[in-house]
UniProtKB/Swiss-Prot annotation:
N6-(pyridoxal phosphate)lysine carried by residues: K226
Pfam families: SHMT
Assigned GO CC terms: cytosol
Subcellular location: Cytoplasm
Amino-acid positions noted as binding (6S)-5,6,7,8-tetrahydrofolate in the UniProt annotation, renumbered to this chain: L118, G122, H123, L124, E242
Cofactor(s) listed in the protein's UniProt record: pyridoxal 5'-phosphate
This protein's UniProt keywords: Amino-acid biosynthesis, Cytoplasm, One-carbon metabolism, Pyridoxal phosphate, Transferase
Disulfide pairings: none
EC number: 2.1.2.1
One GO MF term: pyridoxal phosphate binding
Pathway annotation from the record: One-carbon metabolism; tetrahydrofolate interconversion; Amino-acid biosynthesis; glycine biosynthesis; glycine from L-serine: step 1/1
Protein name in UniProt: Serine hydroxymethyltransferase
SUPFAM superfamilies membership: PLP-dependent transferases (SSF53383)
Amino acid sequence: MNKKVTLHDQDIADLINKESHRQEEHIELIASENYVSEDVMKAAGSSLTNKYGEGYPGKRYYGGCEFVDEIEKIAQERACKLFNAKYANVQPYSGSVANAAIYMALLNPGDSVLGLSLDSGGHLTHGYRISFSGIFYKSYTYTVNQDGVLDYDEILKIAQEVKPKMIICGYSAYSQIVDFAKFREIADAVGAYLFADIAHISGLVIANLHPSPMGYADVVATTTHKTLRGTRGAIILTNNEEIAKKIDRAVFPGNQGGPLFHQIAAKAVSFYEALQPEFIEYQRQIILNCKVFCQTFINKGVRVISGMTKNHLFTIDVKTSYNLTGKQAEQILSKMNITVNKNTIPFDTESPMVSSGIRLGVAAMTSRDFKEDEFIILANLIDKALREPNNETLHQVIKKEIAKLSHSFPIKRNYLDKK
């Protein structure tokens, strides 16, 4: 997909082109990455980059906003349609900024929050001690059980003990279905707000392949990349008018200044693509691919956290299965042009920078038209490589096989044209 970039600044041009080449050559299994369409890239690289403004459509602090106002309104309308929401803020620069705005809107500094622990699959912004969410707020955690799944009775028990003002559900490395109705019951039992972070599963939610949190959560946030396959950024959704007003104030002026209009336009374009039938088929293929990918590892005796996946990702315990750390596994696979990320596993004894697992996601390679057969081949190659981590001869053979796969499935320019 990626065309060679030419710039007066040769240093940056060379690095951009090297990164484009890396993306073409590597098998991308990082669950938070995907390939946007050329249309999304055009919007993100458009003249909208030049336009500055503050505030919201019809209520700007700068002139000349008549066209960006319309773009932002279209993005809002499409986001609401995709998720069956009444209100959408499409300005957040990133998922972390969106989450920070939600904290600011609903909490006061020092208020308590309850989220999934990082090693169980939670996110930094869900109360981790080195994040703003753990620095400015009193954070408590729940974990998965020994089987790697959420225990809602235990979560209720913890919530009753700590009485959080906000409960967070939605994760960065959890492969099972999230029961938002159960979380609503828990939140109601302790008088807490419920915040659903669906950054990873939003594409699946759109396609009705995972239950939606709308109608259960007080507020919902998602990034616009990952399974949504849009530009980098985030949106915040709610059905509550008063919360919507608080969210708007928390985004601007609370956490951000001027919106990135080029990114809002790119979000709108990706929402347009997500409203098409092709997007639903893509999400269905993600589920099919991930199940086969996961099952192939299970068949080989590999320990998969939480068992068979029900979404677009899963985490394997490489320490138990291959006597490797996550860091070692990531480095070994990288030499063969397979990109993964090391990941903590529940009750991990290793630090996050080392970890005992690797997280595998299928969204990016499904965008390149990988089907079940390709993921079976890929699982077998990964398993071989990790079982013989010091066999350089084998690794060179695997690298050649990976090259064949990547060249057979180039990055696509668009996802709507059949030609």
